A protein has these predicted regions:
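Bacterial N-terminal signal peptides
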Residues: 2-11
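Active-site-proximal cofactor/substrate-binding loop regions of enzyme domains
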Residues: 10, 17-98
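Non-catalytic, surface beta->alpha helical segment in thiol-disulfide oxidoreductase systems
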Residues: 80, 90-130
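Short amphipathic beta-strand and strand-loop transition segments with alternating hydrophobic
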Residues: 134-139
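Short, well-ordered beta-strand segments enriched in hydrophobic/aromatic residues
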Residues: 142-144
């Protein structure tokens, strides 16, 4: 019986399965701005998809419409998603918008995304001493 257990443990250790994902210390929102016609987006899409498997990570994907003028109409894009990305550009004082772009916890941004780089940024944001999040409500015409 002990030999069977040791064999099973050895098989698990060498089976090539990925180690369980580390849980973030606090919930972290990860926003991906992407486009169907973007050559660099599949890698970022995959990295965010893998990050979403981490307990505590809330992944959101936004298809932007500003590449539609090139002739490839993105079926997931919405003007509101492009506006959200431009709002981050202003808030973070970035020079422009691009795809893919990942915004982590509304504070950190990555242009493009590789799994290791994204994982490190998520863990950094999860450890930040800014919990609970700062929330601001503004009245803008008919919306709050």
């Amino acid at each position: 019986m002990a030999a069977a257990a040791a064999c099973a443990i050895g098989m698990l250790a060498t089976s090539g399965e990925a180690a369980p994902r580390r849980t973030t210390e606090r919930p972290v929102v990860v926003e991906l701005f992407t486009a169907q016609g973007c050559a660099g987006c599949p890698e970022a899409n995959l990295a965010v998809e893998q990050a979403a498997e981490t307990p505590g990570v809330i992944a959101l994907t936004y298809g932007v419409d500003y590449w539609d003028y090139l002739g490839w109409r993105d079926t997931f894009a919405k003007p509101a998603f492009s506006a959200r990305q431009r709002a981050y550009r202003s808030a973070m004082r970035l020079r422009g918008v691009s795809t893919p772009q990942v915004v982590i916890a509304g504070r950190t941004q990555l242009t493009g995304a590789r799994e290791v780089e994204l994982g490190s940024a998520i863990q950094r944001e999860a450890r930040r001493e800014s919990w609970p999040p700062q929330i601001e409500f503004r009245e803008t015409g008919r919306q709050v």
